[in-house]
Every structure is written in structure tokens, then in C-alpha cells.
Amino acid sequence: RNQPTAALGHLLPEGTPVPLIPVLIIIETISLFIRPLALGVRLTANLTAGHLLIQLIATAAFVLLPMMPTVAILTSIVLFLLTLLEIAVAMIQAYVFVLLLSLYL
């Protein structure tokens, strides 16, 4: 029940040579800590990219409004649809984040 070999057994592949055991344990431990961190970075990058796209389109619609009102209105409609898409993507990203985090831990 409290055997360290059983608890740390998943850090080593079967048949690992004895001199490589300390190095592989360190590498696998670092890998276990990096996975959730990389998952958070990916989630942040995906959400930031969506927000930047919405900001760019909103700025374009604002600039186009005095010159071409019809194009600005069409751009605003596209902006609204992209906002709905961004909300859906955020929900999917949250689901994937929680699912993968629970698998990693």
C-alpha cells in the first residue's frame, strides 16, 4: 500500500537499465509538471487569438462607419457572429482543459 516502488512505477518503462533510472525519473517528473502548464498556455493562446480577431474587426468597422456605412453594418454583423463563435470556442476550450487536466492529474 505504501510501497514507493509501486507509486513511482509509472515513471519508468519496463526493463530500464539501472544507471538510467535516476535520469528517467527526473525527466518524467518534469514532464508531469509541464503538461498542465503547456495546456494552460495553449488555452490562453487560443482565447487571445479570438479576442484579437474580434478587436481588429471592431476597429475596422469603427473606421469604416463614416466612409462606408453599409460595409460597416455588414462588418458589425460579421463581428456579432464571430462573437458567438468565440463564446462557443471558449466553452469547448474550457471543456477540453478540464478533461485533459483531469487525465493528467
UniProtKB/Swiss-Prot annotation:
Subunit a, of the mitochondrial membrane ATP synthase complex (F(1)F(0) ATP synthase or Complex V) that produces ATP from ADP in the presence of a proton gradient across the membrane which is generated by electron transport complexes of the respiratory chain. ATP synthase complex consist of a soluble F(1) head domain - the catalytic core - and a membrane F(1) domain - the membrane proton channel. These two domains are linked by a central stalk rotating inside the F(1) region and a stationary peripheral stalk. It is found in: Mitochondrion inner membrane. Component of the ATP synthase complex composed at least of ATP5F1A/subunit alpha, ATP5F1B/subunit beta, ATP5MC1/subunit c (homooctomer), MT-ATP6/subunit a, MT-ATP8/subunit 8, ATP5ME/subunit e, ATP5MF/subunit f, ATP5MG/subunit g, ATP5MK/subunit k, ATP5MJ/subunit j, ATP5F1C/subunit gamma, ATP5F1D/subunit delta, ATP5F1E/subunit epsilon, ATP5PF/subunit F6, ATP5PB/subunit b, ATP5PD/subunit d, ATP5PO/subunit OSCP. Belongs to the ATPase A chain family. Its main location: mitochondrion. It catalyses: H(+)(in) = H(+)(out). One of its GO terms (biological process) is proton motive force-driven ATP synthesis. This is ATP synthase F(0) complex subunit a. Keywords: ATP synthesis, CF(0), Hydrogen ion transport, Ion transport, Membrane, Mitochondrion, Mitochondrion inner membrane, Transmembrane, Transmembrane helix, Transport. One of its GO terms (cellular component) is proton-transporting ATP synthase complex. PROSITE patterns: ATPASE_A. The keyword Ligase does not apply. One of its GO terms (molecular function) is proton channel activity. The chain crosses the membrane at residues 14-34, 47-67, 72-92. The keyword DNA damage does not apply. It is a multi-pass membrane protein. Coiled coil: none annotated. Changing I26V: In haplotypes MA.
